Amino acid sequence: MAKGEVLIIDDDPDLCAAMQAALQSEGFTVRCANQGSLGLKMMRERRPDVVFLDIIMRMPTEGVWVSEEIANDPELRSVPVVMLTSIVGSEFAGHFPTDRPLHAHKFLDKPVPLNQIIEIASHFACQPASSYN
């Protein structure tokens, strides 16, 4: 029996593969999407227990858009979102929109140790979804 279901939305294939391998070795079912629209489609097909979401993908604020879509969807808004980014110190740092709220339950700077990813996934997978609203 799987510990829970994790969706990773990130355009970095190496990061996705590393996170997927680490989480699967701990008993999680893991799906990956390399762009926001695909991640939303996958969420609507089968709701995950937690989403790890990159902020900067094809567009500098694609992850912000995805988090807004999740927050505005009654079927998805209870899914915990963990935002991942390497924006600190990047060329995008000065262009990031600070006037829009980030709809995230946790915010992590890359690189994130894989053991921390596992701990976070374990925490959210064993909590009732209603406790995140």
Predicted segments with their positions:
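Helix N-cap/capping motif at the beta->alpha junctions
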Residues: C32-K41, E62-G63
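Short amphipathic alpha-helix used as the core "switch/output" element in two-component signaling
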Residues: K41, V64-R77
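Conserved sequence signature across two-component system core domains
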Residues: I9-D10, A33, V51
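Alpha4 helix (beta4-alpha4-beta5 surface) of REC/receiver domains from two-component response regulators
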Residues: T61-W65, S86-D109, N115, E119, ...
